[in-house]
Amino acid sequence: NVGNSYSEYMIKDLLREKYGYEGVVCTDWDITGDPDPDLDAFGSRCYGVEDLSVAQRHLRIIMNGVDQFGGNQDKEPVMEAYRIGCDLYGEETMRRRMEESAVRILMNIFRTGLFENPYLEEEESKKTVGAEEYVKAGYQAQLDSIVLLKNKGGILPLKEKTRVYVPKRHIRGRKGFFRGMLPEQEIRPVSRELLEKHFIWADSPQEADAALVFIESPLTDGGFENGTYVPISLQYRPYTAEHARETSIAGSTWRENDRNRSYQGKTGHTANEEDLDLVINTKKAMGEKPVIVCLTMHNPTVCSEFEPYADAILAEFGVSTKAMLDMAAGVSVPKGRLPVQLPRDMEIVEKHREDVAFDLEAYIDEEGNCYDYGFGLDFQGEKLS
């Protein structure tokens, strides 16, 4: 019971011998180091071979037929693995094995002609890299991906020279992907120079005709807290998982004391809960003047918390701020449609079946629109087809 790269059956017997794969095999990232005993740490994952030394782990992977080590920055464990292998199998065997990997890796370079002609003609490169035609096509793709979820009263597009207020954001410190702490952030979503390409900068809600509120989908700490599992929330306010399953499907690793990973009854928090406050407080300050929410969506979002306070909602999945401003100004028409369902609430999320598509009950906004897979509006409020 070992990780795939350590499995002779998976790599050597099946992949190499039975299915005849002759290409490069690379390990997952960071699987050869000693694991961190802390559950809430991005430690190495040498599953099933914790009793081997780092060099011995490298040797086992090499002898299985793997060619590259993902995330390893130090050649010494590979060299030590070679020396151990020479003692165990002989230098001829080890050299032949290393040459096999060298051939596989180098063939990828040979096939693309990088050895025969590794040089570039600068003028030719300029015709392709950053070529105006491709830049325009790429930017249009950004615009086409933006989804208009709500447009109450046809607020969008905003007229040129509309006085627009954009509030600052605050995100508390949180753990990043590698589990290190990220500092808190004060964010100015839009520069004055960029906004004034279409609109007039307003320093306060009182001066503004409309507000653009930039927020992100809920940012969580990855499901761990104080050595235990907690829910990963898709809502902004603290979420207590009352409807989560009592017994988890999977568990556990050697770092865990309990095979049950259930987080039922536990509470998860988001680093950007203040994004919700930003929408609510901006709406209060703006009164009857329109508030447009610009949502950067990293994952499906429970929109029920902020949607009632928004006159319009634009959702995007990684486009530039310029693209969002151009869309708000009507430079392009909305063509984007949701690639996921946006759930009604977290209870629905907990009850849905992870291996079945489209079984979520999607959120319905005050305009009667259902934020289901494939949903999107045009500026006239008609659903895209």
Protein language model annotation of sequence segments:
Residues N1-Y6, D13-G20, C26-D36, D51, ...:
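C-terminal non-catalytic regions of proteins with extracellular/luminal or membrane-system context
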Residues R96, A102, M107-V147:
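Helix-enriched interaction subdomains in cytosolic or periplasmic regions
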